[in-house]
Amino acid sequence: MTNSSATSNPQPSDVEIAQAHTLEPITTIAERAGIPEAALIPYGRTKAKIDVPALRAEREGVNKKGKLVLVTAMSPTPAGEGKSTVLIGLADAVRTAGRQTMVAIREPSQGPVMGIKGGAAGGGYAQIVPMEDINLHFTGDMHAITAATNTLAAMVDNHVQHGNALGIDPRRVTWRRCLDVNDRSLRHVVTGLGGPGQGTPREGGFDITAASEIMAILCLATDLEDLKKRIGRIVVGQTYDRRPVTAGDLKCAGAITALLRDAINPNLVQTLGGTPALVHGGPFANIAHGCNSLIATTTALDLSEVVLTEAGFGSDLGAEKFFDIKSRAGDLDVAATVVVATIRSLKHNGDSVLKAGLANLERHVSNIRKFGVEPVVALNLFSSDTAAERSMVADWGEQFGVRVVECSVWAEGGAGAADLATAVLEVVDGVSDEDASSSSHQIYQPVDGVEATLHTLATEIYGAADVQFGPQALKDLAFLKDNGWDKLPVCVSKTQYSFSDDPSALGAPSGHTLHVRELVPRIGAGFVVALTGDVMTLPGLPKKPAAERIDVNAQGVISGLF
């Protein structure tokens, strides 16, 4: 998130602000969160993992469940609208208001950090720190997921090489390798070249780690045992007679789980304001389910009064998947939802006309209401915003019956979200556990089938009139039905820039057709991925990647991260 200051005063870069801040010892943050020493696994002085089984044992008999606040956004510009930044500033403001507070968000992917984003741990004076560590290697979770994914790929090819007892058809191997780098040249590759001793030649490819099934599994598993069961169910391909082959068939679920033994533990860090933050798991919302790990969220809810979490991009992507996939898997109830908006994005979605762009925000608010939750709109201020523009958004809020609260957390940190915290806490305090459980809900029932689910999402959330299945999607649908997988939740892979599958159709398009090109069974994760439009599961670098600005000096101090 860049330069969303409500003032025109020069401000240091995000990394300069983070490096100038004196971090509290992670033991102090753990104590503030109520995490006993026996459940803390330090990674240096400012990072740690939480041993969740040890924490549960230490807290046995303690019946505490916090209120969950979900932060989403309107359709973004390519630069993003500061959703994470607002969440972090809001969390600091809620803690300042006297509530025991925790943040539970995703960890950044190295690909976008080196690509277009240049960092993804908040911005300005609303950051999670140590930001350099979080944005680069952190505690190694991404590497563990990458290693697990590629080990499974190696096991598939090795089985084919050594007799192929399962009868795997190399032409129908669906398991792809992954890496945490934006590299378009690896989307489609041929492996096994070089002769009989080098493997069986076949077409394959790479996905970015954040889009891998093992990332999704890690983020939806409830514990290590559940993780291993889910990994065993991963479908890696088909036999010559079209039967599915799983990781369990390859007898490697235990080995893959062993690689993830430590990665399943949530990571504990802190905001600039000293609020404990669990940063764990990082599936993208446009090509995956877009939510942090279920283990981190439930752990935070067990420890705090108020937990703030986010779901990637807008109500049509991360928020929908939060309610329909993550919430369903973890039986989560949402007490309040914040929709982040900016004048910049309103103009972008209105072809430079702010008033026209309000239709986009209006649909996002309407979508959230369909999940049974009344949202608060957070208007994230920029120095370029005029009083007239801000007034127009406020007037729209009154007319549409939704509360709009301005915030300036990039420039002011938690102090810039004091009014927003008041508004959100009013909603949270007005919702009992019973109310949250009975009101927040999913928008479809998987038992109705994949076709019905996609039609519901297309018409109710995207504003579409119809769904069109391409030739490959129709074949995939038949395969799903043959194996009894057509009644799973659906994770739609779709552009984040539009309610349609066309990234150029900004605003609030309606009456369009959702084009589904493939249906991919992610049985370990427990859902079916619907690939739409031209979305790629391995991004490429832009013409001027953020990596060109990132540097490190002789003392090891990193610069160039936003």
Swiss-Prot record:
Known InterPro entries for this protein? Formate_THF_ligase, Formate_THF_ligase_CS, P-loop_NTPase
Q: Which pathway is this protein engaged in?
A: One-carbon metabolism; tetrahydrofolate interconversion
What EC number(s) does this enzyme carry? 6.3.4.3
Q: Which family does it belong to?
A: Belongs to the formate--tetrahydrofolate ligase family.
Q: What is the lineage of its organism?
A: Bacteria, Bacillati, Actinomycetota, Actinomycetes, Mycobacteriales
Which sites bind ATP?
A: T77, P78, A79, G80, E81, G82, K83, S84
State the name under which the record lists this protein: Formate--tetrahydrofolate ligase
Q: Which UniProt keywords apply?
A: ATP-binding, Ligase, Nucleotide-binding, One-carbon metabolism
Q: Name one GO biological process term.
A: tetrahydrofolate interconversion
Does the record bear Cell wall biogenesis/degradation in its keywords?
no
The GO molecular function terms of this record are:
ATP binding; formate-tetrahydrofolate ligase activity
Please give the organism. Answer: Corynebacterium jeikeium (strain K411)
Q: Does this UniProt record's set of keywords contain ATP-binding?
A: yes
**Pfam families given in the database record:** FTHFS (PF01268)
Enzymatic reactions: (6S)-5,6,7,8-tetrahydrofolate + formate + ATP = (6R)-10-formyltetrahydrofolate + ADP + phosphate
